[in-house]
Amino acid sequence: MSNTNGGSVGKCPVMHGGQTSTDKSVMDWWPNALNLDILHQHDSKTNPFGPDFNYKEELKKLDVDALKQDLKDLMTNSQVWWPADWGHYGGLMIRMAWHAAGSYRIADGRGGAATGNQRFAPLNSWPDNANLDKARRLLWPIKRKYGNKLSWADLIILAGNMAYESMGFKTFGFGFGREDIWHPEKDTYWGSEQEWLAPSGAKNSRYSGERDLENPLAAVMMGLIYVNPEGVDGNPDPLKTAQDMRVTFARMAMNDEETVALTAGGHTVGKCHGNGDAANLGPDPEGADVHEQGLGWMNHKTRGIGRDTVTSGLEGAWTTHPTQWDNGYFYLLFKYDWELKKSPAGAWQWEPIDIEEQDKPVDVEDGSKRYNPIMTDADMALKMDPEYRKISERFQQDPAYFEDMFARAWFKLTHRDMGPKSCYLGPDVPSEDLIWQDPTPAGKTDYNVDLVKGKIEASGLSIADLVATAWDSARTYRGSDRRGGANGARIRLAPQKDWQGNEPERLSRVLAVLESIAAEEGCSVADAIVLAGNVGIELAARAAGHDVSVPFAPGRGDASQDMTDVESFEVLEPVADGFRNWLKKDYVVKPEELLLDRAQLMGLTAPEMTVLIGGLRVLGSNYGGSKDGVFTDRVGTLSNDFFVNLTDMAYTWKPAGENQYEIRDRKTDQVKWTATRVDLVFGSNSILRSYAEVYAQDDNQEKFIHDFVAAWTKVMNADRFDLQ
């Protein structure tokens, strides 16, 4: 639209009936309110595809060989608007894929490359992701060509693989299957700092104590993927940087050997860019004006491309031949002594002393010119930290071993958040099962389900035992990286069998019964555990006067201890479970916020979370048999009593200690029930109360049971990727 009013500026033409910009939201006015938005993401209202779209089916139409060739051709098809270094985009594409996958953290499974989230804020505008918008824009013609048959998430990682292969490296494999999201994720906590690259001593720092990094964060600074390339807080000291690397990579699920392999393999090709003044760069993509069309960090003051590009501020390549895979990284690292210098952009970097001319990489535009290679503080850590040095020396002496280790580490980095191997699609999925994939064998489906259910019902186990055991087995599932869940029955293995939240003594007693039944009838223990929960619910519904059959799909397998990486599974241990009204200890975070986080990881909506809480309470499935929140006089009956009594104004609610409340009769002042914050939030939060009122209605008792069974089944089947 053009302004036809002589250039004068008028007042806003709308009466602010809709909030279209960033004026104060409800959460801004009441910042301590429970943010239920994290449960309502990525639904049909933001997804341009209809409910019938199936990415798995679209992938079957993809010509993978043609796609891979197109990507290899792209690598050397330099564009005038963003020229390729040495005529090859490989380094840029690898950095894009690395930074997409490298945002993953093992503590909550969030981040990573499985959703294509690098296209959206904040990741698309992180300082560490500067100029990766150019990489994605270079890929756009390929995305446009293959359309619905290829997600951005898959394309970003495959581009990294093909970049390596086009430079002579053989990758370990590739699995398709990453599905795109369509807006920024609202559930991922990136840190509480108020500025990019805030040092560790700044306000709201992610560090406490000596240098204790806040959970679940992995990166050392807001806006970085892993560590600061100049050193801790920008101060070069390779030994201190080594400690940051060890923490950061461990939180990305990598050990020391994988850390060295990824650092060296990532820096074998490509370069850093800092040949100019960063002050000449424009805003990041989210802050740029509309005419930039989603591109950021544009330099309209100087040339700003090719050899004059500014990205990280460091300037130079790590190796003599930055467009080919070789062992040149370790060759230069150990051949020369290195000294600190400043890049043209003013960043700290390490440069070799008295380097031979033939060891210098050539200029990205003029092959007759040579410049010093560089190392970051992280690179120098591989030489100066004793443990990293041992690994680096072995890699230098055995290039084939290094190549294999890097191939495996790169595959792990780029597939860690995709879930089990059954989620990998396409012709290049490696046949080898890897321990970090949480392998689980297929289970049987040809046994008599009704006979198993009958034996469980006759076993003497209580409804609470049946329901709690099934819930504990399934609740570990997290949609963020598709780990955990009931399949595999790892609740009977270390470390889960000993987790406090699983009530080990009760669990052992119940499992002994279920394992015996499973052995007698030829089903997996995993199936028997889920069936036990279903039986408990059916019995409780029958007690309420409703004949219900809880849906069940056989086929879960039983993992072995050898298939289970104990250390890797320890991060799945719940520290709280509001569904069973349990806290391992008191936390700064409110119990209801911990509940919300758990519900989001499990893939639940707010109504599903609500109905599950109400049902689990009346089934008596609280941790340790606690009576908190059990607002019923008929425990074990699947009734809507929790909601009826929570919303009944015949009662008052009074604090009775830390996270403890009493529900008293208004007339007699007698204590009727006790509760926690998790219970009362369903009456205090206006949104949750609206759901509670629905289930409290006289005409919705049957709806309550129906919705509870549906939500329960969703939880039990969350990790059944074979059914999806």
UniProtKB/Swiss-Prot annotation:
Active site (UniProt): H99
Source organism, top-level taxon: Bacteria
Site, as annotated: Transition state stabilizer: R95
Entry GO terms, CC: cytosol
GO biological process annotation, one example: hydrogen peroxide catabolic process
Catalytic activity: H2O2 + AH2 = A + 2 H2O; 2 H2O2 = O2 + 2 H2O
Gene Ontology molecular functions: catalase activity; heme binding; metal ion binding
Positions bearing the Tryptophyl-tyrosyl-methioninium (Tyr-Met) (with W-98) cross-link: Y226-M252
PTM annotation, UniProt: Formation of the three residue Trp-Tyr-Met cross-link is important for the catalase, but not the peroxidase activity of the enzyme.
Protein residues bound to heme b: H267
Cofactor annotation comment: Binds 1 heme b (iron(II)-protoporphyrin IX) group per dimer.
Record SUPFAM superfamilies: Heme-dependent peroxidases (SSF48113)
HAMAP family in the record: Catal_peroxid
Subunit details: Homodimer or homotetramer.
Protein purpose: Bifunctional enzyme with both catalase and broad-spectrum peroxidase activity.
Family: Belongs to the peroxidase family. Peroxidase/catalase subfamily.
Protein name per Swiss-Prot or TrEMBL: Catalase-peroxidase 2
Native organism: Vibrio parahaemolyticus serotype O3:K6 (strain RIMD 2210633)
Gene assigned in the entry: katG2
